[in-house]
Amino acid sequence: MAAKERLDKLLCDRGWVESRARAQSLIMQGFFRVGGRVITKPGTRVPVDVEIEWVRPP
């Protein structure tokens, strides 16, 4: 089983955003799909090897 990490931290670690605060804002606005699902809670723990997509919110 893969290790899990907070989504906001994972986005920073992957270099997608410049800060955790920015990641949290974008996540709450619905900009990221994780494993095919839109996640809106920054503290959601996801596998570190999960596929993340940048999407336009509805």
Task: Describe each model-derived feature in a short phrase.
Residues M1-V48:
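A basic, amphipathic helix-loop patch mediating RNA/tRNA/ribosome contacts
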Residues E51-P58:
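SAM-dependent Rossmann-like transferase core, predominantly class I methyltransferases
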